[in-house]
């Protein structure tokens, strides 16, 4: 009887857990702007921080086996345009060498919103961060709520959210 109860309980718990949404790769490529970033080590994403970047474009290479990411970094107020290629590991998890080793996962994508979860290892510490991107220059209240939910699920503090679009004065 105990075994039947435990089996039933296990089945209910498994059923109640949210199934991760499937990523539609056709929605990944395009013109994207970073709206928000959050990190457990906020120093990495504050203005002048090494991981504060301003996305412009993401392209899929070979059916998203690699991602070409075009973005700006600011160096003493000067916008530097860079393009880096991230190589797919599994699912929608990619590895990119930039200010350390970065494991980047596309965790949500819709018509107007894309969210990445990044773990950056700089040789000393792993920083967990999320990046909330939009096709425009803002999130709807529902998109912001979704972004905050994804932060919570990944252990990234919502109080560390930085509004990057406010400081994005780099060329389109």
Swiss-Prot record:
One of its GO terms (molecular function) is odorant binding. Keywords: Allergen, Disulfide bond, Pyrrolidone carboxylic acid, Secreted, Signal, Transport. The modification Pyrrolidone carboxylic acid is found at residue 17. InterPro entries: Calycin (IPR012674), Lipocalin (IPR002345), Lipocln_cytosolic_FA-bd_dom (IPR000566), OBP-like (IPR002448). Found exclusively in skin. Produced in sweat glands and transported to the skin surface. Residues 1-16 form the signal peptide. Pfam families: Lipocalin. PANTHER family: ALLERGEN BOS D 2 (PTHR11430:SF89), LIPOCALIN (PTHR11430). Probable pheromone carrier. This is Allergen Bos d 2. It comes from Bos taurus (Bovine).
């Amino acid at each position: 009887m105990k075994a039947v109860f435990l089996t039933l309980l296990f089945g209910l718990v498994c059923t109640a857990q949210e199934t991760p949404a499937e990523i539609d790769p056709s929605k990944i490529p395009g013109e994207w702007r970073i709206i928000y970033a959050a990190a457990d080590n906020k120093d990495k994403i504050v203005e002048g921080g090494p991981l504060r970047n301003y996305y412009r474009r993401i392209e899929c290479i070979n059916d998203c086996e690699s991602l070409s990411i075009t973005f700006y970094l600011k160096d003493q107020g000067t916008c530097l345009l860079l393009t880096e290629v991230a190589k797919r590991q599994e699912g929608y998890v990619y590895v990119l060498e930039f200010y350390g080793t970065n494991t980047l996962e596309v965790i949500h994508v819709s018509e107007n919103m894309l969210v990445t979860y990044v773990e950056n290892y700089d040789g000393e510490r792993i920083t967990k961060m999320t990046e909330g991107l939009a096709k425009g220059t803002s999130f709807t209240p529902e998109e912001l709520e979704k972004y905050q939910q994804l932060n919570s699920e990944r252990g990234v503090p919502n109080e560390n959210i930085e509004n990057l679009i406010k400081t994005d004065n780099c060329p389109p």
